[in-house]
Amino acid sequence: CSPATGQKTGTFLDQRDNRALVADHSTDASVLDVFCCSGGFAVHAAAAGAKLIHTIDLSPHAIDEVATNLAANRAVLRSDLTVESTVGDAFEAMEALVRDGRRFDIVVIDPPSFAPREAAVPMALRAYQRLTALGLQLVNDGGLLFQASCSSRIDAEDFYATVHLQADLAGVMLTEIER
């Protein structure tokens, strides 16, 4: 989560409203923050009263940064907050959580760009479909699945269609809160 060490380069102000949306649903919730970077979603959820935060990122530096940011926001002082972290490939980590039978009230999936070139768009859409499938297996019934795409080459309607197609294949009815 720094220009020198990661794909993502810091705090993304364009996600400010989305972090607030997640926080609005986080009181007493269990929250999975996938591709967590500096933990913007995790920190907001913790500050709003989440009971469990589980972060996943490929970068050990990012996971350390989440801990630093939680401490800076005094979230770690809450005795009722459990913080778990996984350093590793997000797809593999999510699959392991599925195998372990884990479920969360809120699942946040905010990956780096999957389509640096136009030729990568089909692969990126398949990755979003796979993330949706995993997210649906990890979110509790009635929970919040939050997905984002920062791939400028992915048309918003194609992204939404991909998410909804996977939900249909899984037999899950989605209710969009916000686009």
Language-model features: where?
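SAM-dependent Rossmann-like transferase core, predominantly class I methyltransferases
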Residues: 1-29
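C-terminal catalytic and target-recognition region of SAM-dependent MTase-like enzymes
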Residues: 103, 130, 144-179
